[in-house]
């Protein structure tokens, strides 16, 4: 399957999320078992709690909010100066751009370090061969990778075709 992906290799712990506008839905690309896999999933509406607190990130005044998403409590800082309901990874849904997001266990942290505008530079993409799968299969493999990396790494043989739902060539 041909897929347009941003330049650069996808590492084993990397995930790219391409948001499908104007329709809703995420197209995610990640590396599992040594292959780039692709899957669709719906965009999930988050139940944000607007909190007291503000800060400045890359020159933008930001407000604080939090929500539970994917089993984690996320605290974010967003700016109304960029009225785009977007943010890092799959974190979105506020009235402004999310410039920082941290989970409560400090296992994941995203922070904007620079914003450039009016660059007039074309976006470059490269065609990558990706294996279509489902979000559920990817989730199960990620859970196995996190809980038992030895068992996960043994799947790199012929068994991975059965797990991912494809037959290797």
Residue ranges and their predicted role:
Residues 1-169:
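Extended soluble regions of mature proteins
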């Amino acid at each position: 399957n041909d897929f347009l992906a941003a330049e650069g290799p996808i590492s084993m712990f990397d995930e790219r999320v391409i948001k499908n506008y104007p329709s809703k839905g995420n197209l995610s690309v990640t590396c599992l078992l040594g292959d780039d896999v692709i899957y669709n999933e719906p965009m999930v509406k988050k139940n944000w709690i607007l909190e007291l607190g503000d800060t400045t990130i890359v020159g933008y005044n930001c407000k604080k909010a939090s929500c539970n998403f994917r089993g984690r409590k996320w605290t974010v800082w967003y700016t109304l100066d960029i009225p785009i309901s977007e943010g890092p990874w799959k974190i979105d849904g506020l009235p402004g751009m999310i410039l920082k997001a941290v989970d409560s266990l400090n296992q994941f942290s995203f922070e904007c370090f620079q914003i450039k505008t009016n660059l007039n530079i074309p976006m470059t993409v490269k065609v990558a061969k990706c294996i279509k799968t489902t979000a559920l299969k990817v989730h199960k493999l990620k859970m196995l990778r996190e809980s038992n990396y030895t068992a996960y790494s043994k799947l790199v043989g012929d068994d991975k075709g059965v797990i991912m739902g494809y037959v290797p060539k």
